[in-house]
Every structure is written in structure tokens, then in C-alpha cells.
Regions:
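Conserved NTP phosphate-binding and transfer environment spanning the P-loop NTPase/kinase superfamily
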Residues: 31-83
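Conserved nucleotide-sensing/catalytic segment adjacent to the nucleotide-binding pocket
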Residues: 1-39
Length: 83
């Protein structure tokens, strides 16, 4: 399963409070996990393993709160444990 950004959005990110910024990017990437951004109260303290099906591909699913300061570190941590 692969993903790519539309040409007009490649190398751009919207950062709340800063606007649209230029960033490095990849032309295409393999999707290997799903991060579901949920309300803080919906993030389980110790979650059971979860997955979701996207176009027949079963991927690990994690529920995180986007505005927790630790969210980027959590995403990196779970991504590093794949394979």
C-alpha cells in the first residue's frame, strides 16, 4: 500500500500558528501503520492491539491525541518497532 501527495501539496505542511511551511518530502511512501488522532479521553492508557483494513491491507492502528507534546515521539516509537 503506497501513498503520495498531490503535486500542489508536495513539500508543504500547515503548522498551526506558523502558517504553510516548506519541508523535505518523499515522492511515494509505503503505508505501514495507521495513527487515529482522537480526543485525549479516547486514548487508552494500555491499549489492546488494534488494526484496520485499508483496501485489503491490514495495518496496525494506534489512537493518539494530536496535541499531546509527546505525540510525535510516540509516532516515531511505534514506527521504529515495525518489522
Amino acid at each position: 500500500l503506497a501513498a503520495s501527495a498531490p503535486k500542489v501539496l508536495r513539500g508543504k505542511i500547515e503548522v498551526r500558528g506558523c502558517g504553510i511551511l516548506d519541508i523535505p518530502y518523499e515522492e511515494s511512501v509505503s503505508i505501514r501503520l495507521v495513527i487515529d488522532l482522537v480526543l485525549r479521553g479516547d486514548v487508552p492508557r494500555v491499549p489492546e492491539p488494534a488494526s484496520c483494513d485499508i483496501a485489503g491491507w491490514v495495518l496496525p492502528l494506534y489512537r493518539l491525541h494530536a496535541f499531546d507534546a509527546s505525540c510525535p515521539a510516540k509516532v516515531r516509537s511505534v514506527a521504529m518497532r515495525l518489522d
